[in-house]
Amino acid sequence: MKKLLLLSLLLGITNGKPLVQQYSIFPFQDKHVHGSSIVELPNGDLLSCWFHGSGERKANDVRIKGSRLKKGSNEWGAVFDMADTPNLPDCNPVLWIDNNEKLWLFWIAVRANQWENSMLRYRTSTDYLNKETPAWNWQDNIILKPGERFSETIQLAFEEHIDEPMWAEYAPPYSRLIIDAAKDPEKRQKGWMTRIHPISLKSGRILLPLYSDGYNISIVAISDDNGNNWRASNPIVGLGPIQPSLVQKQNGHIVAYMRDSGIEPKRILKSISKDNGETWSFAKDTKTPNPSSSIEVLQLKNGNWVMACNDTESSRSQMAILLSFNEGKSWEVKKYIGKHEHNSGITLAYPSLIQSSDGLIHLTYSLKNKKGKTIQHAIFNEDWIKNNR
């Protein structure tokens, strides 16, 4: 592998000083590379993955690729295959380390080249520290069976919120289509897709955020037995709330921030669960713009929240990092990992966020410019976000 491309100079290397670095995980290329995820391994290595191929759902050559950054190194290792379902596109991978230090890879295999037919898959590994490529020791599919309460919740939610003026023309036909589709047991069991890291509650419960392009809503897969069995939460209903990112407040409430796949004004959507992910409030607009693009929110070790997002209504040409000191009531500080003119042809999208054991924040995202496409890795600390320079 070539040396990583250092795009920004190191501004400081100790706590209390601003720090930002950016690297390309691999050289720019013509292939479509997108939807990355990053995780820190127990030994301090970083592992990243993304999907790679000639397209997305309609390209059967798409597979999951990965790379490892060993602790203390400034160069990502050789790219390797992580998952490939023969003759089907594999997309939207998510990496996660559970409380037992088991490595999980969640992703979707797209059947019939349609998002709404996607199959939710996972594989796990306990042998991944001393090898470049994880040795996977288990693989299965996750099949959720939302019951009649699923359709009842959707219908009730739309009936309660249908009269809001901003939805006057759009919502009635939209909501009727969703309500009717929700009554079909077969449709309810397929098409649930990954995008953002799961979270683990103090009880050990795992919450895996999912969404459906068919229903244009979200849901959470819940496991209370370390991922051996999964069941569906009540749906997160709204006008296009998809790709949820979950974060838990000090009072136990869980907030889902979501991409806006609905009507204007384009805003990040927000829903709250007060019962550990079982049920969710109707998704509402926040003040933060969103051009129908993925986001991620992360709770830092000190309790502050960080959000990575495209903060425009129509372009993915800038990637903002927002900081909240009050659990998302307001986002007081903003800094840009990259900011370009809307018509520049440069896109920065689909962030994945973690905080490593040394306190640094790691971000991977899709970068496209005139050189081609790559997955970018940015490293920064909270002081960099706070620094106005």
Please place each PLM-identified region on the residue numbering.
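Universal eukaryotic N-terminal targeting presequences
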Residues: 1-2, 16
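Sec-dependent N-terminal signal peptides
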Residues: 3-12
